[in-house]
A protein has these predicted regions:
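Conserved N-terminal beta1-alpha1 strand-loop-helix module at the mouth
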Residues: 1-181, 186-211
């Protein structure tokens, strides 16, 4: 979400969590850290606030999360084990979600390692951190959902599914993967703006598939 208005629009349509994207090497939607903090303060109780960050330095991560005032940090790139340790010890109330980009069989091992490191959940996305300019989300592309289901079966923590989801495919995605939750960005936007009609159709698709 890029503004308080967008955040409240998502909440009004039933969103359980709000994603706030900090500076990224590529992709749509990053907003300044001070705006992230302002939106996080404005979100009503009971709605989770996710800070999406590409930072990997443990000290930088802790400082950014503390400043943002969110209740969940979504790590979109690989981080050293020390980052998990520091986040857990210094910010124990903040949930840790590790993103794994599904580009092949190695994603299974990456998810298992992340789960073993003590994260609260794993989120599967369709970025590519191996590119010269990393793509760490917001690609609008799907990935192999059969592989996503395998990952869900292999890890002991909740799994979120992202990557190219929209109203037309989210029902199939939920049926095939059975994730804990789904994450959407480009699939509910038109020319970069949150689209009320697309959002309503997406939420309806999620509810129909989950009933």
């Amino acid at each position: 979400m890029r503004s308080v208005r967008e955040a409240w629009l998502a909440v009004e349509h039933g969103a359980d969590a709000i994603g706030l994207v900090s500076a990224m090497p590529s992709g749509p939607g990053p907003i300044p850290d001070d705006r992230i903090a302002a939106i996080a303060r404005a979100v009503p109780p009971g709605v989770a606030t996710f800070l999406l960050t590409c930072r990997t330095d443990p000290g930088d991560l802790v400082e950014q999360v503390r400043t943002a005032g969110v209740d969940t940090v979504q790590l979109v790139d690989r981080v050293p084990r020390l980052a998990y340790v520091l986040l857990a010890s210094l910010l124990p109330a903040v949930r840790r979600v590790q993103v794994v980009h599904v580009n092949g069989e190695e994603a299974v091992a990456d998810a298992v390692v992340a789960a073993a490191a003590g994260v609260h959940a794993v989120l599967l996305d369709s970025g590519d951190p191996t590119l010269p300019v990393k793509r760490l989300g917001g690609t609008g592309r799907t990935h192999d959902w059969d592989l996503s289901r395998r990952i869900r079966e292999e890890i002991p923590v909740p799994l979120w599914l992202a990557g190219g989801l929209h109203a037309g495919n989210v029902g199939d995605a939920i049926a095939r993967v059975r994730p804990f939750g789904v994450d959407v960005c480009t699939g509910v936007r038109t020319r970069g703006r949150l689209d009320r009609e697309k959002l309503a159709r997406f939420v309806a698709g999620v509810r129909a598939a989950s009933s």
